[in-house]
Amino acid sequence: RKVIFNAMCLFGILCCGLSVRAQLPNGLDFTSAAEKTVHCVVHIRCEATVQSVFYDDFFSFFLSPQARERSYETSGSGVIVSEDGYIITNNHVVQDAETINVVLNDKRSFSARLVGNDPASDLAVIKIEAEGLDAIEYGNSDDVRVGEWVLAVGNPFNLTSTVTAGIVSAKARDINILGNKMSNAPIESFIQTDAVINPGNSGGALVNLRGELV
């Protein structure tokens, strides 16, 4: 009876999978876009130092509070936009970084330098010394339609080359997403998606089913 019950459960799971698959539009395929994009998305690791004030009840009676330096690491994603090593990412991924390290999809690692950044749009450009890289193709975000399938490609929680799928939930969203930290950095008119995005996805790619950056 246990074997029959397990078999029935397995059959039910398979049937559920088939029914979901049957509901997808004919010709819908994520694999081509995913395979085309993962080689264009990199893992970014940064190191920075901040000064924190150290308080001690005993010593503070005689001395002023002491400042101590503390090192910390951050990580995110980036998108290769040229064969000679220019990479776009979010400004908050590399902001105040003293060292920037880029790991490609093929596990090669490079030191990177900051070329330019714009806190207002939360964008930054970094550069690695490499040639013959796979650069992403650009789509036109104006052509993106609400309800259209898109893929989010990045490195959430340091899990490299992670792809999630969702739809475009809305366009031209206006929200000061960094307002709590940077009051002068409004991010406006961005694409909202329900694709799963986690810490570490910042700076990664949102692509259409042709593998084009939107």
Where are these regions (language model features)?
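General helical structural elements
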Residues: 5-6, 49
